[in-house]
Amino acid sequence: MINPIKYNISFGYRGADNNSAEVNTKKPVRTSIFYVNDFHGKAINMERAVTASNAFDRFTFQKPTDKLKLASGDIMLGEDIGVNRVAMQFLKFIGVTATAVGNHECDMKSEDFFSEITGMPATLLACNIKNPQDSKLSKYVQKSCVQEINGTKYGLIGTIPSDLISRIKYGKVLQDQNIQPANIDETIKYVQDEVDKLKSQGVDKIILLSHSGYGYDIKIAKNTNGIDVILGGHSHNLLNGIQKDINLFYSKSGEPVIITQAGRDGKNFGILNLEFDKNGVITKAQNNIGTTRDFSRNAIARYIFEKIKGKPEIIGEIRTAPPALKNDLTEPNPLAYYGADALRELTGADIALIGAANMRGYVEKGKIDTSVIEEISPFKNKIVKINYTEKEIVDAIKYSAKSIKSRNNKPGIMYVSGLKYTMTKEGDVTSLSYIDKQGKECPIDINNPRTDKIYSTAINDYFSSNNDGYDMLNKYFEATERYSWDLNYAIEQKIRAAKEPIDIVDDGRIIITD
């Protein structure tokens, strides 16, 4: 359980001279922010987060404390209206008053986008959209707003990701609506303009709801004045606590700026406790990250969500479930292995590949229903079968292994069926073998892979279309088979066909050594 009151990290104003470094804390303002980002339509984790939010609401502080509920975007996902209505209901359930516009809020077709956000319970914020004032979007999205709690005014600003158009499915449609994000340099200027506007109104506590990503958030923090907190998203970092040069930076004028982010897929949420001096400068802070799996699913939220999406069907039973991953981009994932096996079996391919970025869900011991299945890989990427050379497969595995040392661990390692490999913690592949359908292991020379050896491969349409740097897999238009179903369908069919409860365990097909 999270204790949202302990203020155990203290820092003062780092000004240009001794006088400006002095902090007056005679009349501090205390603030506690419950924040969420990048839930990606995950209804089950939303249900758990509702329980956590309710606990936050019930908590009584020893001293007067303002409470805020804020989001940093990508609470929605995809074009499924039901999924996105659940996301909006979630924001209403937990009482979020403002949210940044993320790229996944824009996944829908433009007509659906505008229809659905009409009912958005929170204020949509994005100051860095370059579009005419008469654009339809400007009627729904504000650059900033002011929220007043117990007589204290908080200025809230939002940013949309600069790579928006490349990250949404209907980019051309949204371009037709004159939706164009600013680049980072322009974004910094637009953010500063909003800060200055709020400051001129007497607001001295400024929170940026950013869906720009961690790297850009750091640039914004260092190159602006007046921002106190950046509640971040988009890059899926998990920033626990407060550490200098990690998520504590200083503005151009030397004031502290705290950056937060709570990972992805609703696995976590955050509570940021703050104390401001009379000038609106942070003097104390604590940043706690909570895990949604530590909280039960809220019964009322579950009922409402099922009314929106339909009641799920129980399809099987999990006898052994794998433990939660600490890093779901770089760790062996037994559920991904199960999914890859399902793809290989259903397509009859020699091997199957699943990029770690596509694995978003988890299973627990006990009965499993279709609502759990649909959250395992929510992107609905269709499966194809493609002939790849041994060299192309080796190059893909080697490329994915480098994720363990790359920034943000992207694109993530490649999960496999019909293969097994060993890699080091430095991201070097040291061995690779093909496992034929009779279980025979055939070593592959990773230093001299064959170009005349072909493997039929089950893979999705995303990773076979030159995304995430996998240029060696860019053969979508050479597919020998195209299927109308996705990874979730394959997993569901495998579970339904099981005659006994299922054990999902690590079989050692990917080993990471020192």
Q: Which residue stretches match the model-derived regions?
A:
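Compositionally biased regions
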Residues: 11, 21, 54, 145, ...
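Catalytic centers of hydrolytic enzymes
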Residues: 27-30, 36-42, 179, 262-514
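Non-Sec secretion/translocation targeting segments of pathogen effectors
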Residues: 1-23
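Compositionally biased, intrinsically disordered low-complexity segments
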Residues: 8, 12-14, 26, 49, ...
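Compositionally biased, low-structure terminal segments
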Residues: 12, 60-62, 296, 306
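Acidic, metal/ion-coordinating pockets
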Residues: 23-292, 330-336, 342, 352, ...
